[in-house]
Amino acid sequence: MNFTRQRTSPIHAGEIISYKNVDLLRRFITEQGKILPRRLTGVTAKEQRQLAKAIKQARILGFLQFLYKE
């Protein structure tokens, strides 16, 4: 018998994916400012699209930086 483990989403049920929720968005960005792929984060395809859209919107509005320099 094969047992597959059901993945749990790193985004909890109460959390809203929004450009204003900067703390949530920072969890899905690398130190260089790149958006992490879903195979590393474990989010669903729908959540990944929402995250990418929210991160890009937050960058344009100035909530997040485009590049993180040392």
From Swiss-Prot:
Disulfide bonds: none
Keyword set includes Iron: no
A single MF term (Gene Ontology): small ribosomal subunit rRNA binding
Record key words, sorted: Chloroplast, Plastid, Ribonucleoprotein, Ribosomal protein, RNA-binding, rRNA-binding
UniProt main location, coarse: plastid
One BP term from GO: translation
Pfam families: Ribosomal_S18
HAMAP family recorded: Ribosomal_bS18
NCBIfam families in UniProt: S18
Name of the molecule in the record: Small ribosomal subunit protein bS18c
Lineage, top ranks: Eukaryota, Viridiplantae, Chlorophyta, Mamiellophyceae, Mamiellales
